[in-house]
């Protein structure tokens, strides 16, 4: 029976609807008010009533307004044309909305996610008579720098036989590409695009693998000490202004992935505008073209409705899973998951649910876990491998890592890059605290060597704390040298200058080379007459290595500086 309903209550963006008929959880409904249709999602079903969260401002909605039930879940449209786009959480293209509305967006306006008129050059790879299942390739089109595979829609559950497929040529996303037939003789038309519900993980693959290949971000402290694997998960918690967004932008520019998806869910509008302005101007180091050609941005700022903020996270991960099905490596950056959790807290409060810690819903951990678990490495039906790596920034109030969102995130991620106010105030970029952070993945340098270096950082920090109490004269010269060595490692390796063309992105080979130099220095047993001599010598080493960091790898300037470094060390009778 077709459902019918009327509004009986409104609290903020939560609308209670009295209905007759059959409805399903997470079904999309449209509330008719003032000549507009406002999209909403059912989030609770009770006897004769449903509660729906509205994706727009609810001003003007009145008791008695009609409600139209669609019998569909919240979906995204998947097909060629997603890359280089900027969408809101409901996959409305923002540049087109701006053209249509100007500076202030109208309520109830929903546009097509893909360009219906653009023609794509289709190249068929399947042929009539082939048997296919969900996720199998029928052909491809060129989208930017990638081969965008046209696939059998993921909602097809059986095996099908291709009975018709078009020849190579130019087609729109709505044109018929193929016709497939099921076992019962039913025929199904395939176009270049299809819809998929955002809260349902894509499972059209053979099997999942354990992530073990390092995703090189070209940021030394991450790749060497706290690495991230392709298909893995990581989080970047830190106080406001510690550099979370900048670190994510640097990672998206330099990471060893095919496609970057940025979900700006609940960030300040100024930061989102900065991202939208910068990305088209950034040059992709891999292709020499604009970085936007392999980027998709989903943005819902903190000033947009709460429900759409939550939807943007799911929209982004679904688009990521779609491109993973093509055998590509995807990096999804969610900034910030704290705002998403706050949106859940707001809705939970309006639903009058029993609150958990700090009034967050009791199911916060399971929702966060279900999001991060959609990352992973998968083997596709044709044997190729694709991955989605998920990185979420967390903005705990006052930088308190004990709050519920950070703790729930730490339980499910494979790497933790904790930013601290102390390091960001000291102008250390990235402001990742090497003493608190950790990773379960394999990095570009041997684990034993990095643990040896980390032990130096821990010991150096202990000596530093001691010197703050008793002064420099209160520690032995051996302890003082340990402190100087830890500071050398920190300034020359853990910190990076993202404004310098050379130091901003450090290759896998260069990281190994420079770490080995510093590793040998840490192992060396220096003999000094006094602390003044020790400080002077280590400072000379530091300046030399910092200059090497800014010189192109293994070119004339770099080689000269390396000879200077060896001469410095030989002056202490060390064979280097």
UniProtKB/Swiss-Prot annotation:
The keyword Transport applies. GO terms for biological process: proton motive force-driven plasma membrane ATP synthesis. ATP binds at residues 238-245. The keyword Transferase does not apply. Its EC number is 7.1.2.2. Pfam families: ATP-synt_ab (PF00006), ATP-synt_ab_N (PF02874), ATP-synt_ab_Xtn (PF16886), ATP-synt_VA_C (PF22919). One of its GO terms (cellular component) is proton-transporting ATP synthase complex. Gene3D superfamilies: 2.40.30.20, 2.40.50.100, Bovine Mitochondrial F1-atpase, Atp Synthase Beta Chain, Chain D, domain 3, P-loop containing nucleotide triphosphate hydrolases. It is an enzyme of class 7 (translocase). One of its GO terms (molecular function) is proton-transporting ATPase activity, rotational mechanism. It catalyses: ATP + H2O + 4 H(+)(in) = ADP + phosphate + 5 H(+)(out). Keywords: ATP synthesis, ATP-binding, Hydrogen ion transport, Ion transport, Nucleotide-binding, Translocase, Transport. It comes from the Bacteria. Produces ATP from ADP in the presence of a proton gradient across the membrane. The V-type alpha chain is a catalytic subunit. Belongs to the ATPase alpha/beta chains family. This is V-type ATP synthase alpha chain.
């Amino acid at each position: 029976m077709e459902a019918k309903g009327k509004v009986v209550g409104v609290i903020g963006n939560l609308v209670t609807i009295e209905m007759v008929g059959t409805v399903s959880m997470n079904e999309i409904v449209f509330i008719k008010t003032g000549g507009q249709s406002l999209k909403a999602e059912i989030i609770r079903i009770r006897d004769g009533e449903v509660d729906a969260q509205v994706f727009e401002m609810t001003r003007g909605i009145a008791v008695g307004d009609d409600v139209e039930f669609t019998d569909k879940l919240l979906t995204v449209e998947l097909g060629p044309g997603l890359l280089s786009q900027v969408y809101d959480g409901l996959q409305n293209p923002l540049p087109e909305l701006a053209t249509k509305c100007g500076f202030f967006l109208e309520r109830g306006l929903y546009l097509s996610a893909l360009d219906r008129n653009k023609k794509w050059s289709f190249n068929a790879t399947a042929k009539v008579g082939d048997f296919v299942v969900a996720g199998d390739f029928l052909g491809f089109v060129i989208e930017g720098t990638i081969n965008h595979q046209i696939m059998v829609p993921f909602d097809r559950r059986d095996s099908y036989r291709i009975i018709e497929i078009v020849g190579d040529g130019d087609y729109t996303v709505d044109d018929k590409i193929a016709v497939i037939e099921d076992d019962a003789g039913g025929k199904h038309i395939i176009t270049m695009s299809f819809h998929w519900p955002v809260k349902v993980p894509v499972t059209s693959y053979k099997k999942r693998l354990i992530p073990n290949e390092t995703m090189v971000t070209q940021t030394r402290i991450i790749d060497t000490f706290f690495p991230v694997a392709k298909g893995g998960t990581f989080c970047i918690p830190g106080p406001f202004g510690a550099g979370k967004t900048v670190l994510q932008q640097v990672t998206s520019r330099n990471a060893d992935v095919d496609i970057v998806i940025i979900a700006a869910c609940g960030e300040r509008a100024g930061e989102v505008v900065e991202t939208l302005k910068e990305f088209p101007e950034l040059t992709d180091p891999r292709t020499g073209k604009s970085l936007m050609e392999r980027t998709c941005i989903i943005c819902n700022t903190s000033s947009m409705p709460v429900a759409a903020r939550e939807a943007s996270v799911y929209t982004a991960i679904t688009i990521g899973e779609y491109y993973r099905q093509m055998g590509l490596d995807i990096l999804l950056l969610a900034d910030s998951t704290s705002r998403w959790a706050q949106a859940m807290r707001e809705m939970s409060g309006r639903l009058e649910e029993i609150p958990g810690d700090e009034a967050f819903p009791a199911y916060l951990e399971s929702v966060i876990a279900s999001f991060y678990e959609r990352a992973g490495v998968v083997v596709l039906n044709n044997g190729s491998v694709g991955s989605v790596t998920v990185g979420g920034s967390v903005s705990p109030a006052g930088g308190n890592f004990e709050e519920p969102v950070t703790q729930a995130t730490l339980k499910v991620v494979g790497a933790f890059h904790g930013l601290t106010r102390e390091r960001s105030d000291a102008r250390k970029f990235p402001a990742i605290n090497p003493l608190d952070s950790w990773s379960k993945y394999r990095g570009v340098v041997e684990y034993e060597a990095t643990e040896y270096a980390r032990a130096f950082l821990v010991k150096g920090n202990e000596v530093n704390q001691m010197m703050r109490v008793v002064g420099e004269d209160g520690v032995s010269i051996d302890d003082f040298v340990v402190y100087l060595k830890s500071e050398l490692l920190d300034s020359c390796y853990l910190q990076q200058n993202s404004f310098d063309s050379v130091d901003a992105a450090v290759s896998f080979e260069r990281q190994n080379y420079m770490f080995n130099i510093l590793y040998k220095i840490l192992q060396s047993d220096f003999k000094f007459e006094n602390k003044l001599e020790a400080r002077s010598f280590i400072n000379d080493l530091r300046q030399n290595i910092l200059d090497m960091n800014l010189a192109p790898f293994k070119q004339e300037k770099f080689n000269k500086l390396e000879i200077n470094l060896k001469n410095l060390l030989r002056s202490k009778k060390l064979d280097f």
